[in-house]
């Protein structure tokens, strides 16, 4: 029997679709793209709207920053959602998560009035990635592989080397323990998984920090799936695939003007990296690393249990080429230069006039007490200060309840055009914040006096 509903479906005009889409976003701010599309089909069963057209329609929604979008400036709409694993109330009592309408996704807002210089929270990375500028210090045991604290000399007496390889060194036993899930997981330790050596050498030789992030995400999930309580692997799956903003790296780079010239080389490079990752973290039964990898999984299991093979669904979710591109895009969107991926920090949206400052402060820093606020922001780091990759989140000025907390993703000293181009290439959107709107009519996008 023919589907009369499908036969009767019509393609709505933009004049009808866009207002409906705006109402849909407003009424369901917590839903992702695919769930919104499903809701649209429920609300308007008479319409035929493909996922491709639906995504294009979302690109005409307001840009991040609160201004109005220029229809000629299409944005990439990231898939995002809420991360139920983060206890925001205990980490940052004066902050709450909010889902915004108009394609903006999630963000953070103030629950109470915040004073200038007030510390909102501190946070360590849950996935640690190193700046290429740190490679020589790390390989010479002059820096902690977990927190990036500098040593006064190589391998100081109180430090802890990795017991299995010579590529990682730590401040103390605590940093070493943290590293097993965030910076130096067993599945990427060359002493335990020899095939990881060529992968990590490739990453450092090429300065592929985003690939390092993908490798450590996969290694952490695989380790938690094999050795820890099942709940941890499920929690991480929700964080990655439902909680963090992501856009396929291929979709991002297809927006580049030179894509038609570089696409073949980029695809070949991505396929090569994907194969390397798979051989290290999920080798096939015919690969030479398969048996050593199985022995490693058994040796690290608390009960020395035989590994349970990944299901077809798990392989597709974590190790397919399409998932690799999604993870690569996710790391690119969420990675913080000073240390890697931070769970709560990743919730903050961009503004060219941010009200939040993110700092790596000396370990001697003491937050101001409530009765001493407001205070000036801490001075710049001085030579000799002992810092780490722990982030300290500070209010730049007074912030009212309900006001969104924003940071700048780019150098605020750049001109309007430079900032917007950098944001488009790095994060997929054209900024329409108040500052960009004010500077729009000025020559060269320079900031007003």
From Swiss-Prot:
Q: Which reaction does it catalyse?
A: L-lysyl-[histone] + S-adenosyl-L-methionine = N(6)-methyl-L-lysyl-[histone] + S-adenosyl-L-homocysteine + H(+)
Q: Which UniProt keywords apply?
A: Chromosome, Cytoplasm, Methyltransferase, Nucleus, S-adenosyl-L-methionine, Transferase
Q: Which residues form the SET domain?
A: 93-410
One GO cellular component this record assigns the protein to is: nucleus
Q: Which GO terms describe its molecular function?
A: histone H4K20 methyltransferase activity
Q: Which InterPro entries match?
A: SET_dom, SET_dom_sf
Which EC numbers characterise this protein's activity in its record? 2.1.1.-
Question: At the top level of its lineage, which domain of life is listed?
Answer: Eukaryota
Q: What is its main location?
A: nucleus
Location comes to: Nucleus; Chromosome; Cytoplasm
- Provide the GO biological process annotations: methylation; negative regulation of gene expression, epigenetic
By its UniProt entry, which PANTHER family does this protein fall under?
HISTONE-LYSINE N-TRIMETHYLTRANSFERASE SMYD5 (PTHR46402:SF2), SET AND MYND DOMAIN-CONTAINING PROTEIN 5 (PTHR46402)
- UniProt record similarity statement: Belongs to the class V-like SAM-binding methyltransferase superfamily. Histone-lysine methyltransferase family. SET5 subfamily.
What is the protein's known function?
Answer: Histone methyltransferase that monomethylates 'Lys-5', 'Lys-8' and 'Lys-12' of histone H4 (H4K5me1, H4K8me1 and H4K12me1, respectively), thereby controlling gene expression and remodeling chromatin structures.
Instruction: Specify the protein name.
Output: Histone-lysine N-methyltransferase SET5
Q: What organism does the UniProt record list as the source?
A: Cryptococcus neoformans var. neoformans serotype D (strain B-3501A)
Lineage summary: Eukaryota, Fungi, Dikarya, Basidiomycota, Agaricomycotina
């Amino acid at each position: 029997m023919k589907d009369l509903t499908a036969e009767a479906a019509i393609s709505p005009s933009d004049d009808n679709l866009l207002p409906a889409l705006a109402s849909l976003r407003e009424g369901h701010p917590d839903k992702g793209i695919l769930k919104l599309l499903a809701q649209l089909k429920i609300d308007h069963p008479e319409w035929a709207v493909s996922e491709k057209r639906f995504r294009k329609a979302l690109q005409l929604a307001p840009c991040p920053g609160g201004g109005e979008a220029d229809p000629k400036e299409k944005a990439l709409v990231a898939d995002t959602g809420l991360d139920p694993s983060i206890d925001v109330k205990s980490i940052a009592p004066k902050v709450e998560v909010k889902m915004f309408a108009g394609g903006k996704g999630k963000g953070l807002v103030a629950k109470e009035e915040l004073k200038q210089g007030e510390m909102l929270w501190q946070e360590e990375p849950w996935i640690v990635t190193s700046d290429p500028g740190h490679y020589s210090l790390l390989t010479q045991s002059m820096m902690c592989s977990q927190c990036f604290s500098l040593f006064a000399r190589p391998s100081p007496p109180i430090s802890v080397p990795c017991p299995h390889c010579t590529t990682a060194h730590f401040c103390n036993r605590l940093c070493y323990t943290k590293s097993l899930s965030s910076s130096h997981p067993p599945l990427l330790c060359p002493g335990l998984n020899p095939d990881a050596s060529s992968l990590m050498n490739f990453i450092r030789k090429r300065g592929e920090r985003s690939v390092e992030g993908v490798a450590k995400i996969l290694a952490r999930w695989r380790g938690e799936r094999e050795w820890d309580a099942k709940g941890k692997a499920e929690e991480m799956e929700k964080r990655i695939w439902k909680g963090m903003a992501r856009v396929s790296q291929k979709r991002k780079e297809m927006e580049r003007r030179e894509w038609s010239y570089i696409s073949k080389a980029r695809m070949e490079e991505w396929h090569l990296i994907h194969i390397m990752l798979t051989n290290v973290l999920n080798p096939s039964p015919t690969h030479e690393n398969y048996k050593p990898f199985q022995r490693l999984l058994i040796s690290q299991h608390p009960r020395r249990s035989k590994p349970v093979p990944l299901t077809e669904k798990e392989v597709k979710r974590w190790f397919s080429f399409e998932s690799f591109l999604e993870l690569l895009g996710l790391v690119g969107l969420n990675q913080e230069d000073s240390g890697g991926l931070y769970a709560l920090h990743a919730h903050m949206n961009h503004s060219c006039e941010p009200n939040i400052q993110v700092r790596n402060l000396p370990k001697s820093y003491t937050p101001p007490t409530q009765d001493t606020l407001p205070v000036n922001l801490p001075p710049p780091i001085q030579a000799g200060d002992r810092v780490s990759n722990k982030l300290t989140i500070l209010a730049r000025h007074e912030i009212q309840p309900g006001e969104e907390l924003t940071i700048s993703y780019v150098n605020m000293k750049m001109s309007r055009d430079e900032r917007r181009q950098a944001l488009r290439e790095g994060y997929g959107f054209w900024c329409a914040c108040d500052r960009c709107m004010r500077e729009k009519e000025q020559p060269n996008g320079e900031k007003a006096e």
